[in-house]
């Protein structure tokens, strides 16, 4: 199966320029995907392009990841409604270094093979290009009529857009077009890939290559990822799902994939994993027979968490999930780092207690029915303890008068109270 066929069955092709597949079938070629460096981490919205490069390399071709250091200083108007904040060079360089470390989990940069991946930054070839030189060498080959016909430009100039379009952003497609020309000349790059909103910018590049060098280059875009319910992919109430564990914990990352709908799971497992058709068909069959067991979601969450983080991080995320949703022990609870603990219990009621009350030792009855109002009265607490319905840090409480001290704290500042099987309360000691 060739690269285009691989993407096609995975549902990863939106538009493809005629002749692309035939060109790729002639032998190894190079293709690039542009990556916005405005943060020091990729988020899962970037993963479609990254997976395209991964499949490209696996098919024997050479992937190039282009960090948009220069274009990131400007901003792409495609499908955006407002001008972006511009970043300085030092921040962009830092972001590039962080992004390369993440890309190395998907692409082989270190191989001696001729199709080893390469990372480039368009700031390196744009920084010394004068404005006069650029508009003379590049601008004269692309007409304003051609640029105005792009959907991204039309949308920003329409009556429904109140922000208009700055000249800076209008010039973006020329810069992206020049990137393609530069890589065509210097890296033998014949294909640019991206999201479907990038088609206009990519074809500006193929047109520039044709007019400047009389060359032939190709374009391929993937669909913008959507959710079955029409919601925006990759966003939660707390924002983006990042690949950096400091921004999104491996537990929260795992939970995101585990909780996608059945319809989305079957689509996403094709896009975001390397599982083959037979493996996915078998999982889909099991899902149809027993949807409550969620085999698609579980395998999707496993594959992508291991790929982005590690097998150990995945195992820890599964174990953390069991703390909230299944049987677990105090030992498992104590193994959680602070960030994961807070993610696991993000939705439970929280109470704050002064450290002085814990430092000297406080009885459980005073903690849960006085220092907090987890129980409305001490009598109610004693009654529930007697019935075996109270736990502290996942241990059943046998004595309502037991003393709680600093040795009981999780991560030196938390206590987890539980009433019955499902009601949790996080006590924060300050």
UniProtKB/Swiss-Prot annotation:
Q: For this protein, what reaction is catalysed?
A: tRNA(Tyr) + L-tyrosine + ATP = L-tyrosyl-tRNA(Tyr) + AMP + diphosphate + H(+)
Question: Pfam families under this entry?
Answer: SYY_C-terminal, tRNA-synt_1b
Q: Which residues form the S4 RNA-binding domain?
A: 362-430
Provide this UniProt record's keywords sorted from A to Z.
Answer: Aminoacyl-tRNA synthetase, ATP-binding, Cytoplasm, Ligase, Nucleotide-binding, Protein biosynthesis, RNA-binding
Compartment(s):
Cytoplasm
Supply the PANTHER family for this chain.
Answer: TYROSINE--TRNA LIGASE, MITOCHONDRIAL, TYROSYL-TRNA SYNTHETASE
Q: What is this protein called?
A: Tyrosine--tRNA ligase
Which organism is the protein's source?
Porphyromonas gingivalis (strain ATCC BAA-308 / W83)
Q: Which gene encodes it?
A: tyrS
